[in-house]
Swiss-Prot record:
Cell location: Mitochondrion inner membrane
Assembly and binders: Component of the cytochrome c oxidase (complex IV, CIV), a multisubunit enzyme composed of 14 subunits. The complex is composed of a catalytic core of 3 subunits MT-CO1, MT-CO2 and MT-CO3, encoded in the mitochondrial DNA, and 11 supernumerary subunits COX4I, COX5A, COX5B, COX6A, COX6B, COX6C, COX7A, COX7B, COX7C, COX8 and NDUFA4, which are encoded in the nuclear genome.
Membrane-side (Mitochondrial intermembrane) residue stretches: 1-14
Protein name: Cytochrome c oxidase subunit 2
Provenance organism: Polypterus sp. (Bichir)
Length: 48
């Protein structure tokens, strides 16, 4: 059950939704790593 101040997704009620939650976590980590890499590249390019 979702709560009013909940920041994440609600608990999965089926195996497919459980796999979607795992996919969401993996995709979020990949986006974070790519964003960090792009920020590093921009920072090194601007500083030289």
């Amino acid at each position: 059950m979702a709560h009013p101040a909940q920041l994440g997704l609600q608990d999965a009620s089926s195996p497919i939704x459980e796999e979607l939650l795992h996919f969401h976590e993996d995709a979020l980590m990949i986006v974070f790593l790519i964003s960090t890499l792009v920020l590093y590249i921009i920072t090194t390019t601007v500083s030289t």
